[in-house]
């Protein structure tokens, strides 16, 4: 029996065969659909695979990117390899050649050829070696010179007066121009030591200077506390002399056998001041030799009360005919200004700058008279040099009160002097060849031109060093290069840029004086001794000198640019110590070797600070 139909509906029997058939049909349809799907997927897969095989080679396989772990960051392996490769290439292209070049032996590039001023300077310094008196050092390179004057001053002068320099073509030692020459050489060394070093003349120059200052220390009792005299010259003579002396005889220094008198003076304020200036200036040069510098300073200061004393205010040449005939001094107050400035720079003692700026000193010297003859620097006129030297103080340190008023006047006077040197103001005549006639057409023009060229060139360097582009000549502003051009034009004339195309410096250029008025250069170096008058035949011959006195600057041409190369014409053909000192100073100021600047500081090494130093802070307070 069957139970009742709880769900409702018919309780009739189901056709089992029909149900089975329907189920079979459903399963068959499902199976066919699955096979189609599978077949479709397989067809698509086959097409993709074919695409892989048929695609270009660089696209047919895509690899997964790889990375390199650098610790702090991960980068693509490709980027990493590119970076490393680039660094390697950069090393090969840049670093490796540098390493190779640095590992090779170094060859310094050749320096530029020296200019004419340098070449002439080498020559000009040799003149001083040819003028040395006394027992010569072994390294003296002038083959035709030997020991001479080894008994000068003996036995009358304690220690003698051996050494120093002969002045020109004679065998006289004039202390006044010799001291001035040493002062000028020191000045050029202080301002341009780097240039002397650049051309390898620094040690030579100092040897030349020391030979002179060693001798000047013998010309007075430098160990005394109070001086009563100073020696003014050794040897001498007059042009009309008829007894054996340095003028009457024509002998080389090594053969001298006549008496050589020593002249002295108890009232030679000008000479005392000049020697003081020379020693003070040299002490600045030799600061690296403290003992010698101290000795020079002591000598310079010992002379100060001597030349300041009113009882000694006479010129050294007064009453001395053999001095008056050649180096007659005409003033002394210009030397006072000159010495005062150098003493101050050497010692820092304000007493000296106060003296140099005392109004009565420049007024007595006529420093502000604006007279052309007082604008010409020389062994006899220190005004232009002294005022430029103190203008330096104002330009670089500007000390102010109480010196400013007088320093300003010195500065203005220096500017006026420089204006007077310029052609457009027609203060001094010029030859048709361009040589300025500072000595008003008188003989020996080159010495004055050389000193003026140095001062002009130096003043331009002072202004350039302070950043001042020029100065005023009245209402007209003049640039510094105009002064340099002036100095160059005058020195170029001396070196051969003149109507005769002739160098007036022996040994420089192809054409130069061959018959220089000079005893030592005139007589053959054959070890034969000539008597007092025997040498006259060498003076009077028309043949060139057997010995070239290399570097000697002769007196020069006349106002018509004419020069006669004759020994007897001593005004034209004789060199002098002070002339060559001016030439050396001008040449070193103009040469481009070592640069164009000056040494601003060495001059002031001993000058004290202008203002009181800041006091130290108080000690820390403690209860």
From Swiss-Prot:
Active site: 517, 565, 574
Tissue occurrence: Expressed in basal region of leaf blade and proximal parts of leaf and floral organ.
Single Gene Ontology BP annotation: cell wall organization
Residues carrying sugar: 116, 221, 328, 349, 412, 429, 464, 548, 571
Membrane-crossing segments per the record: 80-100
One Pfam family it belongs to: Glyco_hydro_9
Catalytic reaction(s) noted: Endohydrolysis of (1->4)-beta-D-glucosidic linkages in cellulose, lichenin and cereal beta-D-glucans
Topological domain spans for side Cytoplasmic: 1-79
EC number: 3.2.1.4
Localization annotation: Membrane
Domain of life where this protein originates: Eukaryota
Gene3D superfamilies referenced in this protein's UniProt entry, alphabetically: 1.50.10.10
GO cellular component: membrane
Extracellular face residues: 101-623
Membrane topology of the entry: Single-pass type II membrane protein
Family recorded in the similarity comment: Belongs to the glycosyl hydrolase 9 (cellulase E) family.
Name of the protein this chain belongs to: Endoglucanase 7
Species name: Arabidopsis thaliana (Mouse-ear cress)
